[in-house]
């Protein structure tokens, strides 16, 4: 016969297993425009069952528009756009993305926000004429990420590099699927 303690332990273990099994495994969908872009930066759509987080927004409007199509095709609700670097090839596409997904939060660590604020005018003055129609209509500065992680459907995405020698260049580690 099972004691009350054993029954409680088994029930707790069963609930923990069921909760773990219920959490959808996160999936990654990488977009890289390749030679079609001045800077072939990779953007990554991290998707759960219903929601998604985008890491990096592309450089040109054309590449950002392709990214919008990819996100829409996923049928996921974009909750967050995370910007990992302060260089324009990671954030100039924000204008296009936020127009398509106005409810998505745009976040970056403080050092990235500081880097963008310090360089955006010069970067736009230099790259704008070279970009032509791909130039953003306006540049957006992300809100400051609080802490060192993002959450997608209860799963942590850890922001790494904030305590390193170049905190304005971070990356995202996803422990549940052991992916960067």
Where are each of the predicted segments found?
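Bacterial N-terminal signal peptides that target proteins for export
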Residues: 1-10
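N-terminal signal peptide c-region/cleavage motif recognized by signal peptidases
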Residues: 13-21
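Conserved beta-strand hairpin/beta-sheet module of binuclear metal-dependent hydrolase folds
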Residues: 24-73, 171-180
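Extracytoplasmic
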Residues: 26, 41, 76, 83, ...
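Active-site environment of divalent metal-dependent phosphoester hydrolases
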Residues: 38-40, 61-63, 86-91, 113-116, ...
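Active-site HxH/HxHxD metal-binding segment of metal-dependent hydrolases
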Residues: 73-151
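Ligand/cofactor pocket segment of small-molecule handling proteins
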Residues: 141-180
